[in-house]
Amino acid sequence: MKTTMNFVFLFFLPLLINAKPKRVTLHIPLVHNGANFYDSKVVSLPLSSPHSQRGLAFMAEIHFGSPQKKQFLHMDTGSSLTWTQCFPCSDCYAQKIYPKYRPAASITYRDAMCEDSHPKSNPHFAFDPLTRICTYQQHYLDETNIKGTLAQEMITVDTHDGGFKRVHGVYFGCNTLSDGSYFTGTGILGLGVGKYSIIGEFGSKFSFCLGEISEPKASHNLILGDGANVQGHPTVINITEGHTIFQLESIIVGEEITLDDPVQVFVDTGSTLSHLSTNLYYKFVDAFDDLIGSRPLSYEPTLCYKADTIERLEKMDVGFKFDVGAELSVNIHNIFIQQGPPEIRCLAIQNNKESFSHVIIGVIAMQGYNVGYDLSAKTAYINKQDCDM
């Protein structure tokens, strides 16, 4: 009997040694800030400018440390670093909800080691071998800066079914400087690709689903891990400098307009509005002029009409078609938003006059869609659906 038990043990020992720990899947409910649609986003790398958060932001409530302390993080696919403001912070913006995080009060907090990154990388990481502390800094084109210490911490998330899940050793930035003044919440939940991105803690899959913004009871969610919703129409993505890049084949304004050459697209939940290169923006403008048959109130920085002009229009889709046929389209009554006086409606797509040929698709254009990512397969999936979990 003993010989048999030894044989069984020796047979399964290699399997036990090589077994990988099962990854956790996090189902995180999201809420949006219900903001007026003001968007001063400046095209930059990383794409998410903190000033864009004066507009619409989808937020995830995550508990940091032990004992747990709530943080309210803005979901951002345009940047890879997850961060929150830490105490003490001599030059940080004022938080309207939840006090600044105190790492000294958590028994699960620890400073993280890192490798020095390329001098021009953004964010930039630097490791001090004497203090054994990794510092980072991130600069935005609108002159906003953040600085702090890279750390690891236990996070706890309340799940949609009333339970909770914990994950240990998650990388995050502990800010000691945040000189922007327009942040929503306590920090950023960075869903870009990077060595210290939270995405790496859960494998290579994640998805987010955004319901209709105008519906108070609409659901919105984020799923991290193998249980992510990666169903729908596939499209190939490229991963460059931490960004997932889609290929735009055509635009839709009532009818499809095929582009002469594919255009690179960033699907960026850190931006409220969408931003087009000048040439592509005027393709949109010309198509609207022909379709609506009414002179707009303005062309720049975005197309604006009297509200009754838009309200008279029949249902019409405005959107984007990607490589392999995946499509993201929004009803025209959702893509035109109040901006300024109540009698004015403006297209939630702006002309980007920077020397930047990419397209940025913001969250207003993503209403009613689930976007799933399988980074290992370099594939994204776009599916129009209800976001109830």
Curated annotation (Swiss-Prot):
PROSITE patterns: PEPTIDASE_A1. GO terms for biological process: pollen development; proteolysis; regulation of programmed cell death. Its EC number is 3.4.23.-. The active site is at D76, D268. Disulfide bonds join C86-C92, C304-C346. Keywords: Aspartyl protease, Developmental protein, Disulfide bond, Glycoprotein, Hydrolase, Protease, Signal. Residues 1-19 form the signal peptide. Residues 58-383 form the Peptidase A1 domain. Pfam families: TAXi_C (PF14541), TAXi_N (PF14543). Glycans are attached at N238. One of its GO terms (molecular function) is aspartic-type endopeptidase activity. It is an enzyme of class 3 (hydrolase). Gene3D superfamilies: Acid Proteases (2.40.70.10). Disruption phenotype: Premature apoptosis-like programmed cell death (PCD) in tapetum and pollen from developing anthers, leading to collapsed pollen grains. Plants silencing UND exhibit partial male sterility with reduced silique elongation and seed set. Premature apoptosis-like programmed cell death (PCD) in tapetum from developing anthers, leading to collapsed pollen grains. Probable aspartic protease activated by the transcription factor MYB80. May participate in the regulation of the timing of tapetal programmed cell death (PCD) which is critical for pollen development. Belongs to the peptidase A1 family. This is Aspartyl protease UND. It comes from Arabidopsis thaliana.
